[in-house]
Amino acid sequence: WGGLTAKLHGDPGVPMISCSIFDQSYTRALCDLGSSINIMPKVIFEQLQYPALSQTRMFVQLADSTVRHPEGIVENIYVRIRNCFVLADFVVLNMDGDLGLDLILGRPFLNSVKARIDVGSR
């Protein structure tokens, strides 16, 4: 049925936005209603040269069911979307390869910006 639905209505694609952290711009930030956390790949954390990374004992289960132990948590990072600045915490994960995205913005972030995701329009 999924293929038929996509043919009838069209695939709305993946909800991505552009944002900035410090002087770095990211064009592939995934708005993920299925994620209860915000995720930042370790390579991006290292590019930011942010000094503080809090240790954590949590484990993260990814969409492919693999379980990872994060490098840590970076707290109170200002994320800029257009002219708005939003404080966010990110779980920093060592990710394998290029995922095709820069950040994962989960429900906590989407809630704080009062995001509305409309997959019915393009």
Give, region by region, the residue ranges found by the protein language model.
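Proline- and glycine-rich low-complexity segments
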Residues: 1-122
